[in-house]
UniProtKB/Swiss-Prot annotation:
Protein name: Glucose-6-phosphatase catalytic subunit 1
Keywords in alphabetical order: Disease variant, Endoplasmic reticulum, Gluconeogenesis, Glycogen storage disease, Glycoprotein, Hydrolase, Membrane, Transmembrane, Transmembrane helix
Intracellular or extracellular location(s): Endoplasmic reticulum membrane
Topology class, membrane: Multi-pass membrane protein
Keyword Membrane: yes
Organism (species): Homo sapiens
GO biological process: cellular response to insulin stimulus; cholesterol homeostasis; gluconeogenesis; glucose 6-phosphate metabolic process; glucose homeostasis; glucose-6-phosphate transport; glycogen catabolic process; glycogen metabolic process
Amino acid sequence: MEEGMNVLHDFGIQSTHYLQVNYQDSQDWFILVSVIADLRNAFYVLFPIWFHLQEAVGIKLLWVAVIGDWLNLVFKWILFGQRPYWWVLDTDYYSNTSVPLIKQFPVTCETGPGSPSGHAMGTAGVYYVMVTSTLSIFQGKIKPTYRFRCLNVILWLGFWAVQLNVCLSRIYLAAHFPHQVVAGVLSGIAVAETFSHIHSIYNASLKKYFLITFFLFSFAIGFYLLLKGLGVDLLWTLEKAQRWCEQPEWVHIDTTPFASLLKNLGTLFGLGLALNSSMYRESCKGKLSKWLPFRLSSIVASLVLLHVFDSLKPPSQVELVFYVLSFCKSAVVPLASVSVIPYCLAQVLGQPHKKSL
């Protein structure tokens, strides 16, 4: 088993080395792709846009992103996946030959296990939702039929082009092995396809959001404590990252498994608070919500304010404080874009709109 994994890892190292040597000019592109593929952009950019254009799509997108990343965390704890940037330096596989030279970058040194790839899984799930939802919206509305078929082909080609670039980016940056990004893409699609058959998420009560958030948190902590009780160190990757990352400042606490868990659960709970708030009912369920300028204003205001909000980083000196603030910060994102911002805009635009009617 170990020998087989060593061969698989060596293939990944050779792939990374090949990309870094032959595509040096593409370094900035691969870094950009990796940054864009970060799940944070699904919360801060894609969710506000889709929610105010097609509310149901926005809700499903966020659920797929959160549950997908939660499952990614559980998978990583089970699979114990290595990462190329530390494995190539830590293994004795190359004891009888020269160690391949692998470059590291500021976005390389993530601290969690490597399998499956979170970037690939998140991107696949989120973009699968967007493609299938877009096709569902335009199905029967675009005639003749061949135009819809052209749209279908274009969107799916775009989808796979995005997945290919994300996968190559993660391999190039020595953050993942090839088999890890493939597993991420397949897992992300599976999560998104599953949620296409779950309709209860669109009218879930605040109690249901609370119970699901509590269950996800309790399961993750319970699973962590169980494995720890069995002698399994689930934070083994943090030591690897701190030991083998070229620059200590490239190791960030916000890439640890618990940071990801708290951010995702905060986002889901914040969505529940927002969708069950009076501000949401007054602004997004009234006649004004059908007015295109109101929707566009909500999108623009959300993107601007969330961009400013994203620049505020919780202090990381004390881990517990960092995790609590990360949860609260993530909860504010959907709360602001779904209820607070539309409500404030409704107060400003409501009276002129009524007069025009």
